[in-house]
Amino acid sequence: MSERDSGSSGRAKAAAAVAAATPRAKTSGPAPFGAFVRKPVEKAEGKAKAQVANAGSGAAEMRMETVESWPADAVEVGAIVDAYGLKGWVKVAAHADAGHGGDALLSAKRWWLIKGQERKSAPSLQAKMHSDSVVAHLGGVTDRDVALALRGSRVYISRSEFPALGADEFYWVDLLGLDVVNVAGVNLGKVADMIDNGAHSVLRIEYPDTDKSGKPVIGERLIPFVGVFVKTVDQAAKQITVDWEADY
């Protein structure tokens, strides 16, 4: 799963709903980092418009990469699942729909790929939506056989190439690690994951706790990312304020 606040905070109001990306591989569990959630006061409009991305500057061919050359802000956004057609296009199962974070695959100039221990990158010459998948032509992928050899590759995009979001919209990856406090100022823990339960996004928060024997354990809280509970998201302060009691 992973989130950007394009404003200074994401203030929620009374009537709240959250739009979250629909993971391709699963419908619950940790959030795919390519997804985003809108501010808790606003419903998503499902703008899954087809887009085409043309490669800009840089080498036109695929190249080998190392851990050292890998971008520090690389975010996993999908996986290559098959070849598409005969001319070297690949089919990608994105972690998020276009309009819900999957646009990064359509707009990025360069894709970064991991398969096993092998790392590669290639310019995205063209990418577009096809049904519920993304299909793309990468530099150096000249025919179907080369495309088939990329099956199973995990696809990463540099966070700096993610599309800009509207006010009070957040990429999940940018919410991870933020402190969560309630309106009374009580620290509830840190965001460990985001979960999409099909109806809305859920913050999974971890905090230090003890079991019945007094042994230190990691506690967990699940707080729906909806306006009735989420009051502000302040990325500058690395803090989310919620209307949620510590003993809930």
Curated annotation (Swiss-Prot):
Residue ranges of domain PRC barrel in the record: 167-248
GO BP of this protein: ribosomal small subunit biogenesis; rRNA processing
Cellular localisation: Cytoplasm
Listed Low complexity bias regions: 11-27
UniProt entry keywords in alphabetical sequence: Chaperone, Cytoplasm, Ribosome biogenesis, rRNA processing
A GO term, aspect molecular function: ribosome binding
Superkingdom of the organism of origin: Bacteria
Region of interest (Disordered), residue spans: 1-33
Gene3D superfamilies: PRC-barrel domain, RimM
GO CC annotation: cytoplasm; ribosome
Family membership noted in the UniProt record: Belongs to the RimM family.
HAMAP family named among the record's database cross-references: Ribosome_mat_RimM (MF_00014)
Name of this chain's protein: Ribosome maturation factor RimM
Native organism: Paraburkholderia phytofirmans (strain DSM 17436 / LMG 22146 / PsJN)
Taxon lineage: Bacteria, Pseudomonadati, Pseudomonadota, Betaproteobacteria, Burkholderiales
The encoding gene: rimM
